[in-house]
């Protein structure tokens, strides 16, 4: 165990799954297939073993937050204002953050009666490609400087204060922000914020993004496994782009498999791996819980902050 994990309790999958009474998952296999990322693997057994206990833990944190808000209201002699419960989900590119976030969205909406759950990805806070090109940082896309952190912090502040907020929409097909398209985010009961940068500290800012989160999750895996998943995803994206000239990945469909693999490997090595080791993984210990995935995508270990 490294010093980084000294203030985490390591829990095996077997131990974790026994922390929650066995119940039927509140979704079907078809629903699960529809929300998982196309290069990810997850089963209803994973939902039962990992995500139902996790949902129960989130329920404990939510109740604790509400109790504290009520007590502070009494102390300050004013009525406490209802706030959304904000969950941050971070981890590397291709590690399975989106699957975790979409699954939590369904589980929370069905576990808490009449609960509303919003899901936001920080991709929408990337600067448009034109802006990145103008600043000569298109090759740094995904790195801290490629995000509009001022807008992201404004969003978190507004949502935390119960105000709705409009954010830009990002397309993985065009690899860019979609012009004139917005996502209206409601100050729901739960707001899940997913992205590689959600635990990072903005440069020259006194506000930390983690200050806004009531619960935080880091999806982890060995670097070599993440690389394999990334390369697998890249090749599958090409298959989807074959008949769509507007798709960013269409340009690679005329290349040989060897050329494609070489290009994808270079992107991983020079961009995604550097970003992971320098900026994403160092924020791992800011999470409340770390879900570690084995090479078969199954979560085999859980680290819960003490």
From Swiss-Prot:
InterPro entries: P-loop_NTPase, PanK, PRK/URK
Molecular function per GO: ATP binding; pantothenate kinase activity
Keyword annotations: ATP-binding, Coenzyme A biosynthesis, Cytoplasm, Kinase, Nucleotide-binding, Transferase
Enzymatic class: transferase
Binding-site list for ATP: 91-98
Native source species: Streptococcus sanguinis (strain SK36)
EC identifiers of the protein: 2.7.1.33
Top-level taxonomy: Bacteria, Bacillati, Bacillota, Bacilli, Lactobacillales
GO biological process assignments: coenzyme A biosynthetic process
A cellular-component GO term for this protein: cytoplasm
Main location: cytoplasm
Compartments where located: Cytoplasm
Protein name per UniProt: Pantothenate kinase
Highest taxon above the source species: Bacteria
CDD domains reported in the protein's UniProt record: PanK
